Amino acid sequence: MANIFTAGPARALFFYGQQLIGVGKTLSETVFDSSITGEEVRGGPGNLLYGKYFHDPNLNIQITDAMFNLQYVAASLGVDVNQGGVSLYESAKAGETVGASGKITLTETAVAFDGAILAWYKKPADDDWTVATVSENAITIPSAKTGDHYCVKYFYQNMNAKSITIKAQYVPKTLHLVLINDLYSGDVANVAASTSKYGRLITDIPQYQLDGSQNLSWSATSAATVSLNGSALAIDDGTSCEEDPIYGTMTQEIFGAKWQDDVKAVAIGNADIDLAKSASETLQVYAVFGGGVASRMMDNSNFNFTVESGGTSASVNESGVVTATTTAGTAVISVTLKDAAGEATDKIGYANVTVAN
């Protein structure tokens, strides 16, 4: 296997149910932290170590995005984003013009603030603001003259905005998280490839429980970042008859790679077959990868099947179905991998077929 390395923050996909609520392309940090507690099993003279019992496995992930996203904050607080929200109207540079009787008609419909519908005004040159009660969506300024200009502020409902409710007690959302990290070549003989993407590492966490912490820090010398830290929750993937919960999966994808090139040998699960005359059986062919990679039964369309000897007793078709003839005897079937690098004989398996009298 070629030497590879991974560097840089991941890209992230955040799903809530089937809805894609965010794509993290500007993450500044992604930390994948798995841990487990091991208890030593000791006993006997000298209190020897006989084994370890492992418990409390954790998979924690830290994610920091350099860009602000209200959806991320909402997910941390366990709420949904709503269309529309309370906004603050602030006069433009020219201010608002006073009409007859010292009245200024508000551009937007003011809403209540602390139980009353209020607005605040001042002349551009003044420092202090004066509060006024809004009546019929207008304010009256005593002693103001028609044509005077005032700065005005008030709250109104802006349907073009988006808002969230910050609850006093909340449960952070559980998302489906997918992290995508770039892989690069680490081979000395392949320096050019080390500067470009060689592949990618895809981490899939179906149940990602956010920890609910959010620290938006604004300062004069930095931008506020959004965090989406959390932990993986165990799920039963349903692929086994036994309860075998998982936290997720991690997939290494090398661009241009073929699984056939990683096969070290071909093995046949039913390599010794006993058949009655005219009976048939399908070969079960496994690709042996080696290097700690589990062998896997592959579809027979990936292999070539040939009768090497005993053709009078058995035949095999392109789908790997062995059929006995009416002649008793033995036959040898060879199985070779298609589209594999090297000689065909490098990756070959055999099945022995016995046809009963």
Predicted regions and their residues:
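Low-complexity "stalk/linker" and mucin-like segments enriched in Ser/Thr/Pro/Ala/Gly
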Residues: 132, 296-298, 304-320
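Extracellular/luminal low-complexity segments enriched in Ser/Thr/Pro
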Residues: 139-145, 317-329
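Extended beta-strand solenoid/passenger and fiber regions
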Residues: 70-132, 156-195, 291-292, 299
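Extracellular recognition modules
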Residues: 153, 286, 334-336
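Solvent-exposed edge beta-strands and adjacent loop segments
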Residues: 1-77, 128-129, 199-227
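A short beta-strand micro-motif common to beta-rich folds, especially ectodomain repeats
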Residues: 328-341
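Mixed-charge, glycine-accented linear interaction segment located at domain edges/termini
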Residues: 142-144, 201-262
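Short S/T/G/P-enriched beta-strand
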Residues: 257-284, 288-290, 343-357
